[in-house]
Curated annotation (Swiss-Prot):
Function per UniProt: Catalyzes the hydrolysis of N-succinyl-L,L-diaminopimelic acid (SDAP), forming succinate and LL-2,6-diaminopimelate (DAP), an intermediate involved in the bacterial biosynthesis of lysine and meso-diaminopimelic acid, an essential component of bacterial cell walls.
Active-site residues from the entry: D68, E133
Name of this protein: Succinyl-diaminopimelate desuccinylase
Organism: Yersinia enterocolitica serotype O:8 / biotype 1B (strain NCTC 13174 / 8081)
EC category: hydrolase
Protein's gene: dapE
Co-factor requirement: Zn(2+); Co(2+)
């Protein structure tokens, strides 16, 4: 008999849910949850489907995730069609297998098994699911969180099913994430002929010393939980494409991944002071993607570590590396937030895959976390 986790994962992978299109994934999950006594509240915004579901009352443990996936790329490069889940040599292939339909299947089956074993569980088990995580992430978890906070909804613990593992399932648990803020900088000059530089003002030349200082600045030294803040230039643009025109504008986009040693306000102040010091004529727009968050050792981290040690027989590393996740929004509710999911080696790649056995193991870990916190 096929494993129920693998069966559900395959059902979800068959749905081509390119962000923010859910393609029917949430309906599958909702039917399974309603069948075991969950109350389900759709919370849709714009083009995005979300739902908040709960069973029981009291101290609340939520499982969070997303049904949307990234584009497949050239499908001819895949060994099998990306939305036709295939098992080869013990690996489940398909877009979303690792990020993160495998986790969603593991969560739902864990909930089914938990409710069967503990029909009168003492706490509240909840699900927070969105179809807008991989792309804009503006109508998904952030808006659900805002709506829940507005009505003072309780959330004590949240397990996000992002693919946190590196080499084997459970070897890495994310108990925090760095913040992310992007600067869109326009430096203004005067366009002119390259043969008459005295009649122009080259913004690229003016900007180079400032950019050099940005690149060489040590923004902080990090701390025991976070690496040092990093700044990376992502995009540059100047000029008309002609070799005889001095550009009149220079656009620079750069991003900070910052630790809890800094705030977004501190970064803004330091960057703007630097630009003023170099006497640049500029306009600057900031886009804050998320604040850093950290969940210290406590009930949730301990439960997750215990579950991994029990089923994987390894002690996971607690790390805050990598990109942002929806955990940054959920942390605003005051909840302890931890990420535990499959191996991330193939996420967003051609031939995305996950060990089928890992999903079964992951579901058991999720169930044990439920048992430790709300049984």
């Amino acid at each position: 008999m096929i494993c129920p986790v693998i069966d559900l994962a395959q059902q979800l992978i068959k749905r081509p849910s390119l962000s923010p299109n859910d393609a029917g994934c949430q309906e599958i999950m909702i039917q399974r949850l309603e069948a075991i006594g969950f109350t389900v509240e759709p919370m849709n915004f714009g083009d995005t489907l979300n739902f908040w579901a709960w069973r029981g009352e009291g101290e609340t443990l939520a499982f969070a995730g997303h049904t949307d996936v990234v584009p497949t790329g050239d499908e001819s490069h895949w060994c099998s069609p990306p939305f036709e889940p295939t098992i080869r040599d013990g690996m489940l292939y398909g877009r979303g297998a690792a990020d993160m339909k495998g986790s969603l299947a593991a969560m739902v089956v864990a909930a089914e098994r938990f409710v069967a074993a503990h029909p009168n569980h003492k706490g509240r088990l909840a699900f927070m699911i969105t179809s807008d995580e991989e792309a804009k992430a503006i109508n998904g978890t952030v808006k659900v969180v805002n709506a829940l906070m507005a009505r003072h909804e309780r959330l004590d613990y949240c397990l996000v099913g992002e693919p946190s593992s590196t080499d084997r399932v459970g070897d890495v648990v994310k108990n925090g994430r760095r913040g992310s803020i992007t600067a869109n900088l326009h430096i203004h000059g005067i366009q002119g002929h390259v043969a008459y530089p005295h009649l122009a003002d080259n913004p690229v030349h003016r900007a180079i010393p400032a950019l050099n200082e940005l690149v060489t600045t040590q923004w902080d030294e990090g701390n025991e939980f976070f690496p040092a803040t990093s700044m990376q230039i992502a995009n540059l643009h100047a000029g008309t494409g002609s070799n005889n025109v001095i550009p009149g504008e220079f656009y620079v986009q750069f991003n900070f991944r910052f630790s809890t040693e800094l705030t977004d306000s501190m970064i803004k102040q330091r960057v703007e002071a630097l630009l003023e010091r170099h006497q640049l004529d500029y306009t600057l727009e900031w886009v804050l993607s998320g604040q850093p968050f950290l969940t210290a050792r406590g009930a949730l981290v301990d439960a997750v570590v215990n579950a991994v040690e029990h089923y994987a027989e390894i002690t996971p590393q607690l790390l805050t590396t990598g990109g942002t996740s929806d955990g940054r929004f959920i942390a605003l509710m005051g909840a302890q937030v931890v990420e535990l999911g499959p191996v991330n080696a193939t996420i967003h790649k051609v031939n995305e895959c996950v060990h089928a056995a890992d999903l079964q193991l992951l579901s058991r870990m999720y169930q044990k976390i439920m048992e430790q916190l709300i049984a």
